[in-house]
Amino acid sequence: MLKSVHQKVARRTGPLLAWLKLLWVRIDEDHMTTLAGNLAYVSLLSLVPFVAVIFALFAAFPMFSDVSVQLRHFVFANFMPATGDIIQRYIEQFVANSSKMTAVGALGLIVTSLLLMYAIDSALNTIWRSTRQRPKVYSFAVYWMILTLGPLLAGASLVISSYLLSLRWASGFNTMIDDVLRIFPLLLSWLSFWLLYSVVPTTRVPARDALIGSLVAALLFELGKKGFALYITMFPSYQLIYGVLAVIPILFLWVYWTWCIVLLGAEITVTLGDYRKLRQAAREEAESV
């Protein structure tokens, strides 16, 4: 299917339009928006357990105890635009309640968080069309690595940003440090998406393709945050209709939009490799004739 689309489009248009057409066909065949909806639903069910596990991990590392509060503010300010304060207040209440649970309940939180990892794994491997199965132990190790490395990377990034802020007193460094801090969320998103696209698929992902796809996803994510906040501010229809409950559809809409961006970055990464293979096959076919 992809080969026939590439051949038809490549004859009539340039490489960029042929690649965009190939990308559109992949998005349609993979039902990307449906996958994003499924992940949004699972994410909302797993949100409180996931956050509870993350902050429990921070409590286990004394070196990050001082940045735990900063991390909360950073996450809600940079990853949940608009209504972030309200959502933060509710989630912190839920997490505080979850800390009173027994060992069995804590195990349930961890399992629920790992189920979110499994849903992400399934969605990305659907996009990569990979049917190879990992050993269960290896899959668990990958999920646990994402669950632990993610918070630790975020904590380390906050330590670095705090260090940069402490250097602002040095003359001549103010402008440069301000510029670095301004693009810091973008760099963190880029690194996170690159790790996601490189580690989770069960097939080999070229590093260059993953870097390009993750960069596009990170840029769209940063623009999406500003656009979503602007939409909520300029068109407050959800607040008018739902009142106090407006936070629920707003949160779901933002999570869905975020997963659309994540999966689009994955589709871009895959399509770069597919397009390169199709061009190589077309070149070899032309040489054989």
Curated annotation (Swiss-Prot):
Q: Which PANTHER family match?
A: INNER MEMBRANE PROTEIN YHJD, UPF0761 MEMBRANE PROTEIN YIHY
Q: Name one Pfam family in it.
A: Virul_fac_BrkB
Mind telling me what this protein is named?
Answer: UPF0761 membrane protein ESA_04062
Glycosyltransferase among the record's keywords? no
| Protein family according to the UniProt entry | Belongs to the UPF0761 family.
> What membrane topology term does the record carry?
Multi-pass membrane protein
Give the UniProt subcellular location, in the record's own words: Cell inner membrane
